[in-house]
């Protein structure tokens, strides 16, 4: 398994709409395994393939406290949304930024697992929010898109400043 590089906002590749997985092959399973390792390495609770510059409809999630219950969602689809919720969200592709985003409180989701078997599940609370957040990535959408232009610009400026600082440190 390999740790993949996570793209950061405002990288245009994060805006790419992911294509469906035609067939779950050993290559797709390796992508899934690498994504799980990357999610754990980055200390995230979810990761969409788009975030690692792979434009396929693949998501991995693990909201367990023990960090050993990864969920694999290939070609995920939200079948139903119910209620309203929202928490302050963060994102591996927008490091250091958090914002309250309105989401459905409960969702019904259909996806394929790592072996290509279709399954359906109900999600609420953090899992429902995480699923919606990650599926947004597959559509080329980020949580900052829900914010006002001013807040989005502030986040972009902050990330640019951090990037310049890191580059200066590397060149020193």
UniProtKB/Swiss-Prot annotation:
NCBIfam families, sorted: pept_deformyl (TIGR00079), PRK00150.1-3 (NF001159)
InterPro entries on file: Peptide_deformylase (IPR023635), Peptide_deformylase_sf (IPR036821)
Keywords: Hydrolase, Iron, Metal-binding, Protein biosynthesis
A GO MF term: metal ion binding
Annotated function: Removes the formyl group from the N-terminal Met of newly synthesized proteins. Requires at least a dipeptide for an efficient rate of reaction. N-terminal L-methionine is a prerequisite for activity but the enzyme has broad specificity at other positions.
UniProt catalytic activity: N-terminal N-formyl-L-methionyl-[peptide] + H2O = N-terminal L-methionyl-[peptide] + formate
Active-site feature positions: 134
Positions of Fe cation binding: 91, 133, 137
Cofactor: how and how many bound: Binds 1 Fe(2+) ion.
GO biological process: co-translational protein modification; translation
Matches recorded under Pfam families: Pep_deformylase (PF01327)
Endpoints of the signal sequence: none
Names of the cofactor(s): Fe(2+)
Name of the featured protein: Peptide deformylase
Enzyme's top EC category: hydrolase
UniProt record similarity statement: Belongs to the polypeptide deformylase family.
Assigned EC number: 3.5.1.88
């Amino acid at each position: 398994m390999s740790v993949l590089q996570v793209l950061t906002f405002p990288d245009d590749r994060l805006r790419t709409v992911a294509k469906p997985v035609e067939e779950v092959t050993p290559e797709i399973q390796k992508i899934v395994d690498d994504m799980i390792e990357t999610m754990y390495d980055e200390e995230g609770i979810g990761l969409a393939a788009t975030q690692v510059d792979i434009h396929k409809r693949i998501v991995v999630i693990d909201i367990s406290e023990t960090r050993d219950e990864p969920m694999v969602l290939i070609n995920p689809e939200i079948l139903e949304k119910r209620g309203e919720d929202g928490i302050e969200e963060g994102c591996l592709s927008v490091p250091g930024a958090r914002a309250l985003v309105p989401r459905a409180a409960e969702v019904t989701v259909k996806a394929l697992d790592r072996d290509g078997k279709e399954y359906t599940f109900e999600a609420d609370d953090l899992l429902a929010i995480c699923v919606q957040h990650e599926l947004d990535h597959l559509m080329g959408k980020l949580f900052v898109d829900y914010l006002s232009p001013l807040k989005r610009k502030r986040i972009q400026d902050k990330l640019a400043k951090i990037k310049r600082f890191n580059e200066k440190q590397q060149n020193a």
